[in-house]
């Protein structure tokens, strides 16, 4: 449904308030011509109190899924509150990166004019594949080549940004690219390198059920693309940190 059609249907806040939270949020997204794919952050279009409403809505829909799976949640004490647990898990934890703003990150000027390679990692990350909503669990290494105009952020902030980006359904290739965009915009380094290695439970748990395979991908920008020696140094130090 187009933005114009929606605006024609819903003319007042009072009318909107009678809709489920998901429909109100979707209305705002479409009205602002914003995409809302599985790995998009939509927090700017969520108002106070709506996440609680959204959890209740998801729980209700999840109860319907359990019913369709012919699970007797009334007499089975193990599944009495499964729908509510799953809703809370999705909204507050594993898909949290969709629904909350990016964590606050304090940036500091590079007064010391640092221009040597910095590596952060391995950072443990958890995500979910958007195809089957199965877990993705892995590690991320970040290489930064700052310049005198770069911003510096605390080590823990790299982990917080990683968690925010990863906490949503997506494919690994897009997740690493999204993380690179956030760090490039924040730190503004001469070079940025990111490597992610992860287990995909959509492959371990179902389908071919191969529990040995991992997926590794990388993003190299700026100095890491231009300078093969810098790239080798990063990968060698990363491998050394992996063994320790």
Predicted regions: what they are:
Residues 2-244:
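A domain-level signal for the structural core that forms small-molecule/cofactor-binding pockets
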């Amino acid at each position: 449904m187009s933005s114009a059609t929606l605006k024609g249907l819903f003319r007042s806040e009072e009318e909107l308030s009678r809709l489920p939270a998901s429909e109100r949020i979707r209305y705002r997204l479409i009205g602002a011509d914003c995409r809302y794919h599985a790995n998009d952050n939509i927090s700017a279009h969520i108002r106070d109190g709506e996440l609680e409403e959204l959890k209740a809505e998801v729980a209700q829909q999840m109860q319907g899924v359990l019913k369709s799976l012919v699970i007797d949640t009334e007499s089975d004490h193990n599944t009495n509150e499964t729908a509510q647990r799953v809703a809370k898990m999705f909204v507050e934890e594993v898909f949290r990166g969709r629904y909350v703003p990016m964590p606050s990150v304090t940036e500091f000027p590079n007064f010391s004019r640092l221009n040597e390679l910095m590596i952060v990692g391995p950072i443990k990350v958890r995500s979910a594949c958007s195809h089957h909503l199965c877990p993705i669990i892995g590690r991320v290494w970040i290489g930064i080549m700052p310049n005198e105009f770069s911003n510096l952020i605390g080590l823990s902030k790299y982990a917080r940004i990683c968690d925010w980006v990863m906490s949503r359904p997506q494919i690994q290739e897009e997740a690493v690219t999204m993380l690179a965009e956030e760090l490039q915009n924040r730190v503004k380094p001469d070079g940025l390198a990111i490597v992610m290695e992860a287990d995909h439970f959509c492959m371990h748990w179902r389908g071919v059920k191969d529990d040995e395979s991992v997926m590794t991908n990388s993003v190299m920008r700026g100095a890491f693309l231009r300078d093969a020696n810098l790239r080798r140094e990063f990968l060698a130090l990363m491998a050394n940190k992996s063994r320790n």
